[in-house]
Amino acid sequence: QSTGGKAPECLLSNYCNNECTKVHYADKGYCCLLSCYCFGLSDDKKVLEISDSRKKYCDYTIIN
């Protein structure tokens, strides 16, 4: 499940970053497994309902 946005939009270079920073006021955002993945949200709300294994995969993929 993504926060708005369809899969093709996710693949655009700045789509997720814009979505995360402008809409959710996060520090930055990335596309991971065809959904936007936000880092550094200002409040503790979850933008994505995402499984632990998928979160680990996204963290690992984005950081490395």
UniProtKB/Swiss-Prot annotation:
Tissue specificity: Expressed by the venom gland.
Cystine bridges: C10-C31, C16-C36, C20-C38, C32-C58
Coiled coil: none
Family, per entry: Belongs to the long (4 C-C) scorpion toxin superfamily. Sodium channel inhibitor family. Beta subfamily.
Domain notes: Has the structural arrangement of an alpha-helix connected to antiparallel beta-sheets by disulfide bonds (CS-alpha/beta).
Gene3D superfamilies: Knottin, scorpion toxin-like
This protein's name: Beta-insect excitatory toxin OdTx12
Keyword Disulfide bond: yes
Molecular-function GO terms, alphabetical: sodium channel inhibitor activity; toxin activity
Domain LCN-type CS-alpha/beta: 1-59
Organism ancestry: Eukaryota, Metazoa, Ecdysozoa, Arthropoda, Chelicerata
Function, in words: Excitatory insect beta-toxins induce a spastic paralysis. They bind voltage-independently at site-4 of sodium channels (Nav) and shift the voltage of activation toward more negative potentials thereby affecting sodium channel activation and promoting spontaneous and repetitive firing. In vivo, this recombinant protein is lethal to Locusta migratoria larvae after injection, but has no significant effect when orally administered. Is not toxic to mice after intracerebroventricular injection.
This protein's UniProt keywords: Disulfide bond, Ion channel impairing toxin, Neurotoxin, Secreted, Toxin, Voltage-gated sodium channel impairing toxin
Biotechnology (record note): Could be considered as a biological insecticide candidate, when fused to Galanthus nivalis agglutinin (GNA), a protein with the potential to cross the insect gut. This chimeric OdTx12/GNA variant shows a gain in toxicity against insects when administered orally, while maintaining similar effects as the wild-type toxin when injected (toxic to insects and non-toxic to mammals).
Subcellular location: Secreted
